[in-house]
Amino acid sequence: QRAHRLTSVAEGWAKESASRPLRAATRATKAAVAPLIKVNWNQSGSYKKYCPKDGNGQAIVGCVAVGMAQAMSVAQWPKRPSGEFGYDSKTYGYQYINYDKEPAYNWDAILSGANGNDDVARLLWHCGVAVRMNYGVDGSGTQDSYIATALPRNFGYQDSTVKYVPRQSYPDAQSTHLGYGE
């Protein structure tokens, strides 16, 4: 019955549009934007090198940390992390980094994957701790909203330039065009 209703609606629209002359588009189309993120990292293998481990194995990175680091790769920022941060992880206990004691980021090596992705793995670990990653061998997770506080706190981004916008806050048509205004 639902299929019948959908067919009826589609037929009605087809008849309606056939009876009207075609009009030129009133809005200019948006220019195509090439992908901004040029890297393709994942959560396992050499990328998890600095993640915590125990007798059950080594935790994977977590998609929030990967996404955050990939976004940071576009600006190749910061030159170095700063501050310190720690939290209690459910699985691996207290996780802490004194970012001030960490070396500067080598963005050329990060973007090229040189050094066996060691620089990438360190960046991913930094991001994971900064967003309170709940590390696990089979899956690591956290709230993506934590990115908005981690970027200014440990990575030198201005508070005014970081904004958390949940995808579900916008209808599909509107969310498609969010990036054009940035």
Pin down the residues of each PLM region.
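Active-site-adjacent substructure of cysteine-protease-like catalytic cores
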Residues: 149, 153-182
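Active-site-adjacent structural elements in enzyme catalytic domains
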Residues: 1-159
